[in-house]
Curated annotation (Swiss-Prot):
GO cellular component terms listed in the entry, alphabetical order: cytoplasm
Protein name stated in the entry: Histidine--tRNA ligase
PROSITE patterns reported in the protein's UniProt record: AA_TRNA_LIGASE_II
Keyword Magnesium: no
Record's subcellular location: Cytoplasm
Length: 447
């Protein structure tokens, strides 16, 4: 029998690529922690009706892309295609609104859509997202945009642009929907097949069609920005002013509607041209009606999601993330030394040191070569001779200095050892890489 392989549209994420994932997650968590966002973890599968009601049955996600099945209890189940609906379900079910005030939440994890696999787009993919529930204030819209920008800049992305639009409220969209259908109907035969199908069901989705002729037709279509009511226009004006106050540039993009039906008012995408073409790395907007649609109280909300696969591809083109490296590399050889080396490694790890234990049982020379390549600051050498005398050899890998220490003294002076390791790390910074987070402060742009 042949070897079992991963299912099409899924992939294994292996070292050293996992360093990029850990880097992104560490930087995002650091920035979101400072803004007092709290992590939420929701189930990977939910009732199918959650997404049918929340995302919209007329969307491509619900109509074509969901992984749905009936379980052994004859219940319709769907692997989550996005994160917001599950967060909102948890917000309602767990009565989070009872705490009062605004809930600031973030999440990360796998999502599932049946799409044609390609670079940066898999059937199992990962998102990082934030949600602010309980605030209709335009400052919430701009806060999440600023956080998304800060995360991307902290990761080293510089060629970023913000596409911004408003899709208004329900009344605004109904008026615009009628105007758009009236404009597009005479061109129906020239539209691509998907857009012809959407003309009556979901005409706003035609605006982001990738078909060339459809794009040409849409260029002269009515703009939703000309159909905003007074309240919607006021909200959008305030969002734009707040972005300007923070020094965050944006481009008005009236054709930006996003792919999910729950959006209201602000819609946005943060795009990068670092790969030579515009690629959306973060997208979101306001969804003031979703909580009520799913059975909760009327609750304004706004959020975004980042596609991590696409983001990782960008980062791999640009920089090498910091990789974990040991403080100490522990070498051992001998019938008595090897078991004691494991005990010593665990004791040192329990004192907060990063210790790599060589498990090869090969000759000392080969183990020394691996120690040199490991990025460790120093090497501990333990043989049967050292066991007999209660000692250990400490070899500094940068300057090759070597000393003999009593094992008892080594364990009794961990603070001194850490200080010496820190001194060598500072003197020879090439030996180790540590996570560091630099965050663009939008307030720097204020006079």
């Amino acid at each position: 029998m042949g070897a079992i392989q991963a299912i099409r549209g899924t992939r294994d994420i292996l070292p050293p690529e996992t360093n990029y994932w850990q880097w992104v997650e560490a930087i995002a968590k650091s920035i979101l922690d400072r803004a007092l966002y709290q992590e939420i973890r929701t189930p990977i599968f939910e009732q199918t009706s959650l997404f049918e009601r929340g995302i919209g049955e007329a969307t491509d996600v619900v109509g074509k892309e969901m992984y749905s099945f009936t379980d052994r209890g004859d219940r319709p189940i769907t692997l989550r295609p996005e994160g917001t609906a599950g967060v909102v379900r948890a917000y309602i079910e767990q009565n989070l609104q009872a705490a009062g005030g605004v809930q600031r939440l973030w999440y990360t994890g796998p999502m599932f859509r049946y799409e044609r696999p390609q670079a940066g787009r898999q059937r199992q993919f990962h998102q990082l997202g934030v949600e602010v529930l309980g605030s209709a204030d335009p400052r919430a819209d701009v806060e999440v945009i600023a956080l998304g920008t800060d995360i991307l800049k902290a990761l080293g992305l510089s060629n970023l642009s913000l596409a911004l639009n408003s899709v208004g409220n329900g009344g605004d969209r109904q008026r615009y929907r009628e105007a758009l259908i009236a404009y597009l109907t005479p061109f129906k035969a020239e539209l691509d097949p998907d857009s012809q199908d959407r003309l009556e069901r979901n005409p706003l989705r035609i605006l982001d069609s990738k078909a060339k002729r459809t794009q040409e037709i849409v260029q002269d279509a009515p703009s939703i920005l000309d159909h905003l009511g007074v309240d919607s226009q006021r909200h959008f004006d305030q969002v734009q002013q707040l972005l300007t106050n923070l020094g965050i540039a944006y481009q008005l993009t009236p054709t930006l509607v996003r792919g999910l039906d729950y959006y209201t008012h602000t819609a946005f995408e943060i795009q990068s041209s670092d790969l030579g073409a515009q690629a959306t790395v973060c997208g979101g907007g306001r969804y003031d009606g979703l909580v009520a649609e799913l059975g909760g109280p009327v609750t304004p909300a706004v959020g975004w999601a980042m596609g991590l696969e696409r983001l990782i591809i960008l980062l791999q083109q640009m920089a090498t993330p910091p990789a974990p490296s040991p403080d100490l590399y522990l070498i051992s050889k001998g019938e008595k030394a090897e078991p004691q080396a494991l005990i010593l490694a665990q004791k040192l790890r329990n004192q907060g040191l990063a210790v790599a234990l060589d498990l090869s049982a090969s000759a000392f020379g080969k183990q020394f070569k691996r120690a040199d390549k490991s990025g460790a600051i120093a090497c501990l050498v333990l043989g049967d001779g050292e066991i007999a005398t209660g000692t250990v050899q400490l070899k500094w890998l940068a300057d090759k200095a070597q000393e003999t220490l009593q094992l008892q003294d080594l364990m009794g002076n961990i603070t001194e050892l850490k200080q010496r390791l820190a001194g060598h790390r500072e003197k020879y910074p090439h030996l180790t890489s540590n996570f560091s987070v630099t965050c663009h402060d939008p307030m720097d742009n204020l006079v």
